[in-house]
Amino acid sequence: TNAHCSAPGCSPSRNALLYGVEPYKSGLYAFYDQDKFSKSQLEDYTSLPEFFKNNGYATFGSGKIHHRRNPTPVEWTEFYDHKAEKRNPMLFDDSGYRQGNSSKMNFKPTLNPLEDHNDYKNASFGTEILSREHAKPFFLAVGIVKPHLAFVAPKQFFDLYPDPVKPPRIRVKDHEDIPAVGRAMAKLKDDKRFKSDGAWNEVRRAYLACISWADHNVGRLIGALKASPYADNTVVVLWSDHGYSLGEKNHFRKFALWEETTRVPFIIWDTRDQNTKEARVIDDGVSLINIYKTLADLSGLKTPDYVDGFSLAPQMLDPSKPFTKPAICSWGRGNYTVRDKDWRYTRYYNGGEELYHHLNDSDEWTNLSANPKYAAHKKRLASYLPVGEVPMVKKGIETWSIPVSADKPLTNKKKTTPESTKNN
């Protein structure tokens, strides 16, 4: 796809999508424990499930929807919280890899039955909701956690990848034309550790296993929908909160403004459209911020005035229809990237820039920002950058540092400088 998140991190991406407001307008740039917010910080926003509940829908949820927010009756008619259950310990196979002593850095198959895994339970709740008879319209959100770290999944999904995983194309000196802020985001320490341990293959294999495990559970949900009375009267949206780098640009995880970290899977399936035999593909840069207005539009509802983005319903019928604006993604205040059909332009808080022409450079190896030949493209894309931006919301923030933000560095146990950031 050419779809992109609003921020390459779980919390800010989900906040933007679920509240319908870009980080540079809400101040929710980073990771937050929402249950510690004062009400005034969120009272101006109506979350997507709350919006549908206010409009007469029954709302059901399970798994990871918000990042670190406990389910509330304001949003949910019913929410399945697997964390409240007693969990069986994961039994790991001897194969795979573990980095250090952190449980989050496990890249291993488990020997537990499928039913022991939280994602299986999350999907099972969704299939049960689809089997019910509903008296009124309903909104169902199922948050499949994998492929989030740790990369652990049932062994049968690791067995799908017995051979060495083909590595991505990597340029050794790729960072030479990248501004210092971008290099700080890259967090080269993970890449160096995996290389020194000879572990990159196991890391990538574990990621693929987790993807297949997620696909399995999504398939269970789709199967339940097709077997239900709602098979031809439901809008299905598949999305992920951010992309993931597995060595591209010598980078691991997300938390950067490059293609692999901002690009996401994104599918909208309107089962009411019985005339469409083949999928329609939108080539323009699409932002997840548009989900709120799109779902409201397809449901015949009007969104709150503050909601950002635009409805994709016209483009779903005709992908050639022009877009209002390309996808914009931010990571920390003052750091933005703009992605349209063929180009990516990035500007950091201190003026550092990157420009890539994806028709010729899908790996983003050659930064064209200093080349006067491409000044017009840079100027056009820069015109979409925010004119104003609000400061970071400070209260309730976790111990987390956005690399080289325009705001003062957040308090950390370790000192944060413009050339360094805490490794997460």
Where are these regions (language model features)?
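Short arginine-rich
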Residues: 390-392
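Formylglycine-dependent sulfatase
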Residues: 1-348, 353, 362-386, 397, ...
